[in-house]
Regions:
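Catalytic cores of the polymerase beta-like nucleotidyltransferase superfamily
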Residues: 1-311
């Protein structure tokens, strides 16, 4: 049996005091309700990599009523809460932090691209439903298991190998937005998409057609918020994901040079990058992608304004 890794010291050393204070209040609420509570998501991955949590998100999984636990948490901390009862999740905005409580669950997909059907589960099933092994680890938070790492699917090994790996062969057909996430994490972390996962991604690239434009727009927005989004866009172009947004899109040396100029001249933003990405499209093509991705009025205006600029 592998040796149990405990990250209690790393939590206390790596996270800022206000984050630790919020986690401890969540632990107290969970103990009062006798609910198993776990730290999950990118924060666990980044702790193991020794990297800062760049987005100020604290994600926790609860074996039980996550919304009820979030209500008790908010009574202690304040903040603005948004609950989604269908998935038994709650998001709390508090100062600079976003705290997510989610019921540990099992997900099933009736068809490719559909939103999942959710049933209560355990931390084991909850980790298995996640996108990649490096994001499928948890840290126990209840006092009896505080700091214990739950790595059931080889996440630590893939961190060491610098691999982005799916947990099962149907991952991309279940949720094709994972194709964009694989590319984004690969470029952000300096990893490589694991060879078998890469073959699955290429096989299932057309599954992006099963995903609504609104969800694809969200993934594109996340890419455009990266420090150097041209890297992920070039990889998406290479793997065919970019063309699933619109066949005329290209991420070539011209685009990379324009993104670099935007950063040097202080104009870099996700809106400006979107305008550059679509700059070589015709009016008809811009209308098509605007409708398909359901772009906001602000995004549509940025596209047209940036076409008139000299850069």
């Amino acid at each position: 049996m592998p040796k149990q890794i405990n990250l209690a010291g790393k939590i206390e050393k790596s996270l800022p005091p206000d984050a630790i204070a919020l986690i401890k209040k969540a632990i107290a609420a969970a103990e009062w309700k006798d609910l198993p509570l776990y730290l999950v998501g990118g924060l666990v991955r980044d702790l193991l990599l020794g990297q800062a949590n760049g987005n100020n998100d604290i994600d926790m999984a609860v074996e039980g009523d996550a919304v009820g636990l979030a209500v008790d948490f908010v009574e202690k901390t304040g903040g603005e809460m948004t609950a989604h009862t269908m998935f038994n999740t709650a998001k709390i905005s508090l100062d600079k932090w976003t705290v997510d409580f989610a019921m540990a669950r099992t997900e099933t997909y009736e068809r490719p691209g559909a939103l999942p059907s959710v049933t209560p589960g355990t931390i084991q099933t909850d980790l298995f439903r996640r996108d990649f092994t490096v994001n499928a680890m948890a840290i126990g938070l209840n006092p009896a298991h505080y700091g214990e790492l739950y790595d059931l699917y080889g996440g630590m090994k893939d961190l060491d190998k610098k691999y982005i790996r799916v947990l099962h062969a149907n991952s991309f057909t279940d949720d094709a937005t994972r194709i964009w996430r694989a590319i984004r994490y690969e470029q952000r972390l300096g990893f490589k998409i694991e060879p078998d996962t890469l073959q699955l991604l290429k096989r299932d690239a057309t599954a992006l057609k099963t995903v609504g434009g609104f969800r694809l727009r969200h993934e594109l927005e996340l890419v455009l918020k990266e420090p150097e989004p041209e890297k992920a866009l070039a990889r998406a172009d290479e793997l065919g994901a970019l063309q699933e947004l619109h066949p005329s899109l290209k991420a070539d040396e011209w685009l990379a040079s324009k993104f670099q100029i935007a950063r040097r001249t202080g104009r870099a933003s996700s809106l400006f990058y979107l305008g550059l990405l679509t700059r070589r499209m015709t009016d008809a093509e811009i209308l098509q992608i605007t409708k398909f991705l359901r772009l906001t009025a602000e995004q549509a205006m940025a596209i047209h304004e940036i076409r008139e600029l000299t850069i």
